[in-house]
Each structure stands twice: as C-alpha cells, then as structure tokens.
Amino acid sequence: DNSGYGYVVVGVVSGTTLTWGTPIVFESTELRTTPLQVAFDPNTAGSFVIVFQLSSTLVQTVIANTLSGSTLGSFGTAVAFQTTYAANSSSASNKLGFDPNTAGKFALTNVLIAPSPGDSGVVIGTVSGTTVAFAGSAENWDTSDDYPYSNVVWNPNVANEIVVSYIKVGWWAKVVKGTVSGTTVSWGTPSTVNSGHSDYFNLDFDPNTANSFAWAFFNGGTGLGASGAGTLVGSTWTFGSNQTVPTGGSGTTFTIKFDPNQAGKLAVINRGSNGVNFVGSCTAGSVSGTTLTWGSANELTANGDIGGGQQPVALSFSATDTGKFVSVYALGTAGGNELGGVVCQLEASITNLTATNLLGIASAAILD
C-alpha cells in the first residue's frame, strides 16, 4: 500500500493450498519497509507480536495481538524500546525470539544509536494478553562498534540460554552465548564463524537434537551463500566447515530453519541469481554432527525477479505437520509487485525438493 502503513494478513493452509484473508492495519504511521517480523509465542496458543520500525523515529517497536483460527483480535498498544536504540537492519530476520520454555517471555536484539553508536545488546521483554512490557535495560554483549545486523535464538534444549549471531565491524560473522537470569543476561566470549566479508547471517537450533545448530550467510569473498553446522556444549563452540548454498549470489538474503517435527532436517530460503533474474529459492538439507548436506535448489516462483525489499523471502515450519513449511515472497516489477506464498514439503528420506513436493503457490496483496 502506498500509504506506508503497517499491515498484517492471515493465511490459512489446507493441504497444499494457501489462502489469504484481508489485510488489516496495525500501525497507521509510515513504517520502514524493513525490518518487519511476526513472532508467535510457542507456549501460548494464538499469541503473537509484530516488531517494526517507524520511519520518523528509527526506534524498535513491538505490538501484540491474538489469533483464534483465522480471526484476529484487537491489537494492544505499541511499545517502543528506549529511544536511544534503533531497530535492527533489514539483514536481521530473527530480531525477536520467544523463550520456548517460558510463556510470554522474549528476547529482542538492538543497537545503540546514541550516545555511543555501535553498542549492541539484548533486552528481555514480556507479553501478557495484548500488553507488551520491557523488563529492563539492554544487556550489551559488545561495547565496541558492531553493524546492526543481529539475530537472536533461544536454545530449545538448554533452559535460559540464548545465542546472538551478528556482524562485527570488518564484516566478520560472529556468535555469542548469553545466559538469562530474570532480566539480566550474562555473556560468554564471542566466537568467529567467518573472518571474511559476511552478511545476512542467520542461525537456528535443532529442537530435536541437543547442542546442534546450523547457520547461513552471504560470503562476500566468494559472492555465494555459505552455511554450516555446529554444536554448543556449555561454553564450547564447535564449527563444521562452510558449505556453499545453492543459488546464492550478490544481494542475496537468507533464512535457515529446522523442522520441529524431525531431527536433523532443515531448509534454507534465499534470494539469488539464476543467471537471468534474482529469484527466491528453497533448498532442503540435513545435519549429522557438524556436517551439513544440501540437496538441489528449487525456485519459489516462475514469475522472474523477486524484490520489494532487503528481506524478500521468509519461511515458517508447521508445528504439527512433518516437513511442511510456508515461504512468503515479494515479486518485483516482473511479477506485478505482489506478495505471495508457497507451501513446501520436505520428505523425511530426501534432501531435495521436486515438482512433486513443491506445491501450492498463491499470490496476495499488492505492495504499491
């Protein structure tokens, strides 16, 4: 919509069919097109928040609501974190993460814009109904210059443990573990995943395999996507070797997620070049120890280039249907500036997606 307002739309999946409802305004002020994130509380049915950034203030803001079936409730009051902290860059796709073991508790990454630009931290917040509250001040993991490209995930197998993946000045990809006690975060020592030019750094834990995680990022040194698997045991990080992500390319974005219904299975969604256009692709993979193996990439659409923002693709796995996930994409001018989605299916015994299990394309709201 040309107004620049914030909209939310509910999609319903039936088999391989994705049907969209009517877009609803949640913020009638101009927003930055990125970053935007919707996050559901895994411990409270229907409870979710939206993270957004006002164009006028550049401050990270959170609003809560509930979803019953396909019906949205009334939005609560939007709450801005401290005005000295900006929202994350468009490169961050997991700005806010809910604690998988505590209802209504989340962590939110941010970067200081004044008085000391570059300080990076996490704030712990809560949701009760449609009321959002920040429980304290930001807990900084680094007081030296960082780029505001950070993501946060909770370790589902270790209580009160979070991991932040971020980009250090110099474009190094780094991770740091935090231990949460109440509203306080105690930080470990940052570790380096890649000591070269990195961007769009994204990490996820396998909820079905203790200590296991995987990552993906754009490797500026090769011009391709890079990914790998590792383990975190206590304070000890072990990183496997980086593997090339199929169809990664300049300007690409990445979201990597594990299937919550089967151990060691995951997917990556990214934007890359097929030699003609920039397209959205999805690739199935598997992890064994610190070894990550990818199948063949599959394009999300046949409509040509995908654009409309720095984060044109995102994915979410079904909590109940093994291997099923939805990817949302934005088509550029070749596709009529539309938003759309596709229902995808991983097969438990394969690492590739084919014409028989990449199904259900549906287009939706017009962007402009």
For the regions a protein language model found, what residue spans apply to each?
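Primarily extracellular surface-attachment and macromolecule-engagement regions
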Residues: 20, 73-75, 84, 239, ...
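Extracellular glycan-recognition modules
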Residues: 116
